[in-house]
């Protein structure tokens, strides 16, 4: 099913999606558990799709964004998808093995046994976003396929060229009972969220996640929500500020900051503020001597998001903010074919500024200063728990203090974003930044049912322990086990 006409009635849209889901569920039952060979074949087909269509993927991303660095697209959406799939293929047999579990005394001595089996759930729904449309579809499939599941995918309507290509790719490589792509706008997304999947993965904005979770709850569908938030950067006094600025701005300008894990704001020692700005200007100039017509500098996805981000800058200016635009060639961005916004630092923003209230999701970086690191912890803990937190410093005690006294989905020390690329680490949020996780073995387990299996001892005395009559001997045995 490539598309669902938006003009169709809500019931008709839902029915057409449900028909595909029913066929997938029937195939899952009729064909029985997927063998290791079949799971690896599913993964191999996805890897082949990415490799064989890499040029088309880059072209589709460029078309949807208006301008997106081809090498960056290859790194994030192709290489960044092949890696998780290959990792799952190499390790799935180990993940699939039953896990022995311990038994209470004396059952183990009497021959009882217990283990956990990881069983495929069935059909996993995947709602993927526009910022990395291929990566955030294919990377979850690593865990989905490794666990022996089928998938139904709803890509974002904000990237129509990518969605169309994705539908074509999957249609050519998979039967619809294995993988199906459902394209369309909000009405399709709403109908998709209401389906009785065996698990639903949503990546996107928290405001939309509330609707998705509410819809899924009607069928008690478990959800994994990968959201975002305002991921802070805490810079220690003993840091190499120029290097810190370079790493932060590299992360902030990747995809023009349109990353759920992008550093949202930075907190630096007050005496290091000017040095950080100078370092940021230096690295941006090195990376992007020009920006307006530079294919390496990514556009903002659409007019709405462009207006939203420029609105943050204008709001900061109107409220007296010290706004520093990093524009090495002094280009005029008021007249341009693409929605590009130069990297912008807002020094010492005030709490009434929108840039400190909303997730930025763009190349704007508020910079707060502090006297003591305790101020940074208080500030982070006064906000919603973020998807990522970044600490720069060499003081192991201070690092431990930051990690112990803040809560975030994940942490990268002495860089930004990088923890998401470690396949053996879980990726997920906490609280408003998300729930659940995937990647590597954690993805395999998220998309599996951990089934407890117990084999009873053949010893008759085990069964006799629980049967009436409850004489004094049995009473004493029970009481002997109730102790501090």
Residue ranges and their predicted role:
Residues 1-113:
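N-terminal Rossmann-like NAD(P)+-binding subdomain of aldehyde/semialdehyde dehydrogenases
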Residues 28, 47-50, 54, 89-96, ...:
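Structural signal for hydrophobic packing residues in well-ordered secondary-structure cores
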Residues 104-243, 281, 370:
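Rossmann-like NAD(P) dinucleotide-binding subdomain of oxidoreductase/dehydrogenase enzymes
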Residues 17, 36, 54, 241, ...:
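Residues at or immediately preceding the N-termini of alpha-helices
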Residues 2-7, 11, 26, 34-40, ...:
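Conserved C-terminal structural/oligomerization subdomain of aldehyde/semialdehyde dehydrogenase
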Residues 11, 174, 207-350, 413, ...:
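ALDH superfamily catalytic-core signature
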Residues 39, 85, 148, 179, ...:
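Residue-level signal for inorganic ion chemistry
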């Amino acid at each position: 099913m490539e598309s669902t006409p938006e003009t169709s009635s809500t019931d008709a849209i839902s029915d057409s999606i449900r028909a595909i889901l029913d066929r997938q569920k029937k195939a899952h039952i009729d064909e029985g558990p997927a063998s290791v060979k079949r799971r690896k074949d599913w993964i191999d087909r996805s890897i082949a799709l990415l490799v064989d269509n890499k040029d088309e993927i880059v072209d589709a991303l460029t078309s949807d964004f208006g301008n997106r660095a081809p090498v960056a697209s290859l790194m994030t959406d192709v290489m960044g998808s092949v890696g998780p799939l290959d990792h799952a293929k190499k390790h799935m047999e180990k993940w699939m093995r039953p896990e022995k579990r311990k038994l209470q005394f004396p059952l183990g001595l009497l021959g009882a046994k217990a283990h956990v089996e990881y069983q495929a759930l069935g059909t996993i729904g995947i709602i993927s976003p526009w910022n990395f449309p291929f990566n955030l579809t294919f990377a979850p499939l690593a865990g989905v396929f490794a666990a022996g599941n089928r998938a139904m995918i709803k890509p974002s309507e904000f990237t129509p060229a990518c969605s169309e290509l994705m539908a074509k790719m999957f249609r050519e490589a998979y039967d619809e009972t294995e993988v199906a792509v459902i394209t369309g706008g909000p009405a399709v997304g709403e109908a998709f969220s209401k389906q009785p999947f065996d698990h639903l993965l949503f990546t996107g904005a928290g405001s939309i996640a509330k609707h998705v979770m509410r819809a899924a709850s009607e069928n008690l569908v478990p959800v994994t929500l990968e959201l975002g938030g305002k991921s802070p950067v805490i810079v220690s006094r003993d840091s190499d500020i120029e290097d810190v600025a370079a790493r932060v701005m590299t992360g902030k300008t990747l995809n023009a900051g349109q990353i759920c894990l992008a550093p949202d704001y930075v907190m630096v020692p007050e005496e290091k503020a000017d040095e950080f700005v100078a370092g940021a200007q230096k690295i941006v100039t090195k990376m992007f001597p020009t920006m307006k017509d530079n294919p390496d500098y990514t556009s903002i996805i659409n007019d709405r998001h462009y207006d939203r981000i420029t609105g943050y800058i204008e709001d900061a200016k109107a409220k007296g903010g010290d706004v520093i635009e990093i524009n090495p060639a002094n280009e005029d961005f008021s007249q341009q074919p693409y929605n590009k916004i130069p990297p912008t630092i807002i020094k010492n923003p005030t709490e009434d500024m929108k840039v400190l209230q909303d997730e930025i999701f763009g190349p704007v970086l508020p910079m707060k200063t502090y006297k003591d690191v305790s101020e940074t912890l208080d500030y982070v803990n006064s906000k919603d728990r973020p998807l990522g937190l970044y600490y720069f410093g060499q003081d192991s005690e201070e690092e431990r203090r930051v990690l112990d006294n803040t809560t975030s989905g994940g942490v990268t020390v002495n860089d930004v974003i990088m923890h998401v690329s470690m396949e053996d680490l879980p990726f997920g949020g906490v609280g408003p930044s998300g729930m659940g996780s995937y990647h590597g073995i954690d993805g395999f387990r998220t998309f599996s049912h951990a089934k407890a299996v117990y084999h009873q001892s053949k010893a008759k005395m085990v069964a006799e322990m629980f049967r009436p009559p409850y004489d004094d001997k049995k009473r004493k045995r029970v009481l002997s086990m109730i102790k501090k």
